[in-house]
Amino acid sequence: MPIPNDPNLIYFRKRIRILNALGPYLRENNCQPTSFYFDCFSICIDANIEPEEREFHGWWLEMELVNETFEYHYQFGVYNKAGNWVEKPIPKQYQHDVTKTLNQFYEKLSICLTEQLKFNLKPSSILAKTLVLSAA
């Protein structure tokens, strides 16, 4: 078996381990050596139904390594019972709580990337200017 010489492959497991420590946000199955996927089920839409039927308001964030900087973009929406995110506006009464979970995660992610992994973090060019999170 050949020894991998791609630095992104070599450090992928280390990055996964460190990013997993941020909490239940990282979805390893959706990650690649230079791209990572996070999400958060912020608000349960109906807690009175069976757990496997529940839907959630929340967000998902993707980041990709580009020239020693991780570029991110995120979206808000509903995690449906089929297990997929659907981009949808968050109802006004839940916007504060959903945004708060994203901001809290972003602070942790920013510190983790800059202090532990020694990478910068910046918004992707595809992220609308009105959605950009500033560094903590």
Spans of features found by a protein language model:
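N-terminal "first-domain core" detector
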Residues: 1-24
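Contiguous hydrophobic segments
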Residues: 1-7, 52-60, 64-67, 123-136
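Short, charged/polar micro-motifs that form catalytic or ligand-binding hotspots
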Residues: 8, 12, 49-53, 88, ...
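Amphipathic, interaction-prone secondary-structure segments
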Residues: 24-67
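Intrinsically disordered, low-complexity regulatory segments enriched in Ser/Thr/Pro
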Residues: 53-96
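Compositionally biased, intrinsically disordered linkers/stalks adjacent to structured regions
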Residues: 86-136
